[in-house]
Amino acid sequence: MENKQVQPWQQYQALYLHIPFCVQKCLYCDFASYAGFGEQAKRDYTDAVCKEIALRAAEAANMAANASIYFGGGTPSVLPTECIAKLANALKQYGFWQQPCEATIEVNPGTADLAKLQTLRSLGFDRISFGVQSLQDNELRAMGRIHSAQQALEALALARKAGFARISADLIYGLPSQTLTSLQDTLERLTDTGIEHISVYGLIVEEGTPLASLVDKGRITLPDEDTAADMYELVQSFLRERGFERYEISNYAKNGQYSRHNTVYWEYHPYIAFGAAACGFDGQRRRTGLSTVREYIEQLKSFSCGDLRTSALYNIEELSCAELLEEFMFMGLRRSEGASLAEARERFDVDVLQRFASELAPLFEQKLIAYDASTQRLRLTERGMEVGNQIFEVFVIT
């Protein structure tokens, strides 16, 4: 009997572990992250995540070989290194972390020192992502960041010294007090470090954040729409001239140093997740952990060995075929190479070009999208990437 090949959308291709602690919450942040927790709470949380890993050990059998690992937050680096080691070792013990693989950890430059970075490298993390955001001290202060520009540059250098060959940095444009000149200076200083991966995001004022309140009260002024558009263009042209490839709407790499982990998300392949508010996807449904740290810890404490009441620990969302296709197209079109329509046909039994012919026609005419028949991929053009959110709406099936 012929063995049918396991497709990448039939196994977990990545693992995300959420560490929701921060030294201080940034003004713009609406993620599930919390400041003010003491060392005991962090240790209790570590124990709870380790218990969740043990209770879900059977799921390790569905991990793809060399699936990527990602510790995100929050700020994972605020955890004591022994707690990070305990989490990493639990994943390895139960078969979730199979080396060699890409293993990334997020670090705030204000929490980085050489000893900590060397420990992270020794645990098997081979990629590190720094939340730099800006290299202008006034812009960092305006956003409530805990690090200075100098600390960020020092952290990048220390990561190299600790043995990290793969280093990424996040930047934000459209910040209060930011100008085209200050943004260019940040880009110049960052790329001068030799970094090979940069993620750049336009500032979004999320409802309910301190930033939104300050903007509403007129206490913070953001760059106007035209200036923000000029900043976007500056990012594209500057990084292109410095040899960076834009491989996703917000991500740029040199020498093929793409994020394998994030590529799993953009390919809409399954990934498993552990921790409070951590969101996983098995190819059919989304599973999100309890959002509050204390509730998550207490719920795990109540479980005995072999007892995992998913309804008590997770919110499970069953996705319809239409919703799956919608998200597949949203995510795939974020990538420069686009969404695979051959995979869409195999996974969802739909001919995208035929199903959305009338909606796509004007987009082809305006040269906002393009189709490559040789690869069967539909992609956004450079112009299309500027209005990506409007194009994504085409695939919303009501």
State each model region's role:
Residues 14, 227, 358-360, 389:
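Auxiliary N-terminal substrate/complex-recognition segments of SAM-dependent methyltransferases
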